[in-house]
């Protein structure tokens, strides 16, 4: 197979940042953009008190609450590498959107708060990465505060997340005693100076830990560093590229994102060691990024990114070939040719038209309701990219319209918001009430807020007794019989798929027992 566009593909790095809320993910995102020259000034997010709002948090509700609830895509260049950074929602309730974002990246940066160590959301997200053997780099943040001992943090990561740690840098002190980091491979000592440009004072190369220059520079703290590194040499894992690429080992950096300290060391290692675009699985075969025909898939739909235009954008990951503006591609689900006339690339809310793009790049395609999450586009071959699921909701609310004249607008809003994949909508086989289902409770607030502000619809929620849902499939005759007998509990989702909503786990188990010829599914592939 001839390798097409090899140089451009090898320059691409497409990754996401994962963390527990408040570990500093948005701050790190901003600082990476700062080094990439994509922004001139970091818009610091002070927990829910932001006067300026972080560049990547552009939705109105995010601005009010100081949290990220949608995934943004940002592109920047660093040292001749083209970097696509996908910023994922930090809030617990948005794990479904985050999961889908992780299907579009080749590696991940995990951010850990040095004060708190590994937290629940990080654990959940790492399990998702492990399913796909995604390479993971780690940044332990907030060393400018008093936190847990660095060795204790490594042990926490290894035991809780079941992944080897390979420390790349090591902190000298923490909190008020934080002096900087020692690079275990380049033997460089980088001083922390919050007053200096980008928080970084001098970087001095020493001849190993016994260099008397260290005594001169660090004084009494030098012994602590020597003891730590001696312990590491016996207990820690040396960095191995193959183990990192297989998702078995994570290189670890220490720093303070709010002071921009440690970010450049991380970024330098990232561009050198993180993978370029990788092959992707379809239902029939794996597709190499170096194949000539263009292919890719949609992993996210975002409505109303530009309130002035009420637009909808499909976020599309290129997997092979080269995108050229105006090209015709085959929309596999619809079985028809479409022209992509005006694709864009993103810098949070800023968008620019793109003339060409390569595997690893994320482009935005204007969507008039025909593109759905999970859709595959190719230059003809009947391929379908896999692994972009819908999850069964765990929380449900009935939607009550406050103005009966707005029923059409309500339907449009609910269906469009469901197509973005953060919530799901269900319409009963008997009756007309809309039910919204979500993986997390915050999503209900988001839906109500966006219905009012983007679709001018005022509505209220009413409680319903459902606790879980399952998509149902089966042989036609059996399904018809099932529909007749269980009609009171059956709904169609936003895409017209049949779903069974259960008021208790017992009810679900009982129904499954009584209808063994019917298949009940907790997840559903998009499209």
Swiss-Prot record:
It is found in: Cytoplasm. Belongs to the TRAFAC class translation factor GTPase superfamily. Classic translation factor GTPase family. PrfC subfamily. HAMAP family: Rel_fac_3 (MF_00072). Its main location: cytoplasm. GO terms for biological process: regulation of translational termination. One of its GO terms (cellular component) is cytosol. Pfam families: EF-G_D2, GTP_EFTU, RF3_C. Increases the formation of ribosomal termination complexes and stimulates activities of RF-1 and RF-2. It binds guanine nucleotides and has strong preference for UGA stop codons. It may interact directly with the ribosome. The stimulation of RF-1 and RF-2 is significantly reduced by GTP and GDP, but not by GMP. One of its GO terms (molecular function) is GTPase activity. Keywords: Cytoplasm, GTP-binding, Nucleotide-binding, Protein biosynthesis. The gene is prfC. InterPro entries: EF-G-like_DII, EFG_III/V, G_TR_CS, P-loop_NTPase, PrfC, RF3_C, RF3_dom_3_sf, RF3_GTP-bd. The keyword Hydrolase does not apply. NCBIfam families: prfC, PRK00741.1, small_GTP. The lineage of its organism: Bacteria, Pseudomonadati, Thermodesulfobacteriota, Desulfuromonadia, Geobacterales. GTP binds at residues 19-26, 87-91, 141-144. Residues 10-278 form the tr-type G domain. It comes from the Bacteria. This is Peptide chain release factor 3. Disulfide bonds: none annotated.
């Amino acid at each position: 197979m001839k390798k097409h566009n090899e140089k451009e593909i090898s320059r691409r790095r497409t990754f996401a940042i994962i963390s527990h809320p408040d570990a500093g993910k948005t701050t790190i995102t901003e600082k990476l953009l700062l080094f990439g020259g994509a922004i001139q000034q970091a818009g610091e997010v002070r927990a829910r008190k932001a006067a300026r709002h972080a560049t990547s948090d552009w939705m109105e509700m995010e601005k009010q609450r100081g949290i990220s609830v949608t995934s943004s895509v940002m592109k920047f260049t660093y040292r001749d590498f083209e970097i696509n950074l996908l910023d994922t929602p930090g809030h617990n309730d948005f794990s479904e959107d985050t999961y889908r974002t992780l299907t579009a990246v080749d590696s991940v940066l995990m951010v850990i708060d040095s004060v708190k160590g590994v937290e629940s959301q990080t654990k959940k997200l790492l399990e998702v990465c492990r399913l796909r053997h995604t390479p993971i780099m780690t940044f332990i943040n907030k060393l400018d505060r008093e936190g847990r001992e660095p060795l204790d943090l490594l042990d926490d990561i290894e035991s809780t997340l079941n992944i080897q740690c390979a420390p790349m840098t090591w902190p000298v002190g923490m909190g008020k005693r934080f002096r900087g980091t020692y690079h275990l491979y380049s033997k460089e000592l980088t001083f922390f100076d919050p007053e200096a440009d980008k928080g970084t004072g001098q970087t001095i190369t020493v001849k190993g830990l016994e260099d008397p220059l260290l005594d001169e520079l660090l004084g009494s703290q030098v012994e602590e560093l020597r003891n730590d590194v001696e312990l590491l040499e016996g207990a820690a894992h040396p960095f191995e590229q193959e183990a990192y690429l297989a998702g078995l080992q994570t290189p670890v950096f220490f720093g303070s994102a709010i002071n921009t300290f440690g970010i450049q060391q991380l970024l330098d290692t990232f561009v050198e060691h993180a993978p370029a675009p990788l092959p992707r699985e379809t239902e029939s075969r794996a597709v190499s990024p170096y194949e000539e025909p263009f292919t890719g898939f949609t992993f996210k739909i975002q409505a109303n990114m530009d309130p002035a235009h009420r637009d909808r954008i499909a976020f599309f990951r290129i997997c092979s070939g080269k995108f050229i503006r105006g090209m015709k591609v085959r929309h596999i689900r619809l079985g028809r040719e479409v022209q992509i006339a005006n694709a864009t690339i993103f810098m949070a809310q800023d968008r620019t038209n793109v003339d060409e793009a390569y595997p690893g790049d994320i482009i935005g395609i204007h969507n008039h309701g025909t593109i759905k999450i999970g859709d595959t586009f190719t230059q003809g071959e009947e391929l379908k990219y896999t692994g972009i699921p819908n999850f069964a909701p765990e929380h449900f609310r009935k939607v009550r319209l406050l103005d009966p004249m707005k029923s059409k607008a309500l339907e449009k809003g609910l269906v469009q918001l469901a197509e973005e994949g953060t919530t799901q909508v269900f319409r009963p086989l008997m009756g007309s009430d809309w039910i919204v289902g979500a993986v997390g409770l915050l999503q209900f607030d988001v839906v109500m807020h966006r219905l009012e502000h983007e679709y001018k619809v005022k509505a209220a929620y009413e409680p319903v007794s459902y606790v879980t849902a399952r998509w149902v499939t089966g042989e036609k005759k059996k399904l018809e019989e099932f529909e007749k007998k269980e009609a009171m509990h059956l709904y169609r989702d936003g895409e017209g798929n049949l779903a069974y909503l259960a008021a208790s786990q017992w009810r679900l188990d009982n129904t499954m027992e009584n209808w063994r010829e019917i298949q009940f599914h907790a997840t559903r592939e998009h499209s």
